[in-house]
Amino acid sequence: MERGAGASEKGTVLVTGASGFVGSWLVMKLLQAGYTVRATVRDPANVGKTKPLMDLPGATERLSIWKADLAEEGSFHDAIRGCTGVFHVATPMDFLSKDPENEVIKPTVEGMISIMRACKEAGTVRRIVFTSSAGTVNLEERQRPVYDEESWTDVDFCRRVKMTGWMYFVSKTLAEKAALAYAAEHGLDLVTIIPTLVVGPFISASMPPSLITALALITGNAPHYSILKQVQLIHLDDLCDAEIFLFENPAAAGRYVCSSHDVTIHGLAAMLRDRYPEYDVPQRFPGIQDDLQPVRFSSKKLQDLGFTFRYKTLEDMFDAAIRTCQEKGLIPLATAAGGDGFASVRAPGETEATIGA
């Protein structure tokens, strides 16, 4: 444990993967909501990861940093002990792994069960919220027009085809299924939230992987166009609000898709060209047909529970993300006609695709 944190009326909750895109924003929202937060990171000595968290309003009084690693059995036990809630966001992402079964899939699933076991042993955790992924829902031989919580990715298909990021899809799917089974067997209250491609502002200094994909039409990162072909999106703020909503709502149970927009690459490109004429956004996409129909992820279950999305348009979703990237110098303020000379932005270790959640 790095620093102490005072108690709060809302109680103490844990956030895993707290230095990441979603985790850091969730920490901020929980502090704003009045919770005392324990944030886990793999290396508390890494000031570049922890300082943005400790600089958040309320952090001095109600945030503490804890060392924990999904690859180390039992490393979350101390951090979870005494918490009333656990938000599990952390997940290994290594698309270049030479041994994905043992380096990505196994630690993801075993880390999930280790956290579930720690929650059971703590005896104080009233609910666990697991941040899953759209990759647990729609990876299969043939795409359907609509997906919901009843849909599951075909892991055998992923292992056979080995599309870019296949190990991530498999690991998240198996981890979620294992967690749901463990919760049912041991009487734990587990809710899983399934975000689509996450867009929004961010705290960290580097470009979040999901924004490398979401802003590919601006940066000229052509390998990501296939991901944007029929894409579903959620604003980071809406996602974190939904996580807290599901934690606090007594009626919440099971899986919840969290997605507010679906669009084809053509619709997204048209919006970006109109909204940001200073960028050279492509108009044609070789190999992608012009008459695409969107593929929808239904958030009806979440909305029927009473949750309302605040970001109503694509413009609302992208404005803060683009502004933050500009302010941090991660994308240029404009690109010349044709986009010549602009280097694509990539995350460390990234190959041809990046997964949002």
UniProtKB/Swiss-Prot annotation:
Kindly state which keywords UniProt assigns to this record, in alphabetical order: Flavonoid biosynthesis, NADP, Oxidoreductase
Top-rank taxon: Eukaryota
GO MF: dihydrokaempferol 4-reductase activity; flavanone 4-reductase activity; oxidoreductase activity, acting on the CH-OH group of donors, NAD or NADP as acceptor
Q: Does the keyword Iron apply?
A: no
Q: What is its EC number?
A: 1.1.1.219, 1.1.1.234
What chemistry does it catalyse, as a reaction equation? a (2R,3S,4S)-leucoanthocyanidin + NADP(+) = a (2R,3R)-dihydroflavonol + NADPH + H(+); (2S)-flavan-4-ol + NADP(+) = (2S)-flavanone + NADPH + H(+)
One Gene Ontology BP term is:
anthocyanin-containing compound biosynthetic process
**What InterPro entries does this protein's entry cite?**
Epimerase_deHydtase, NAD(P)-bd_dom_sf, NAD(P)_dehydrat-like
Pathway of action: Pigment biosynthesis; anthocyanin biosynthesis
* Binding-site positions, NADP(+): 49, 168
State its role.
Bifunctional enzyme involved in flavonoid metabolism.
Q: What protein family is recorded? A: Belongs to the NAD(P)-dependent epimerase/dehydratase family. Dihydroflavonol-4-reductase subfamily.
Name of this protein? Dihydroflavonol 4-reductase
Protein species of origin: Zea mays (Maize)
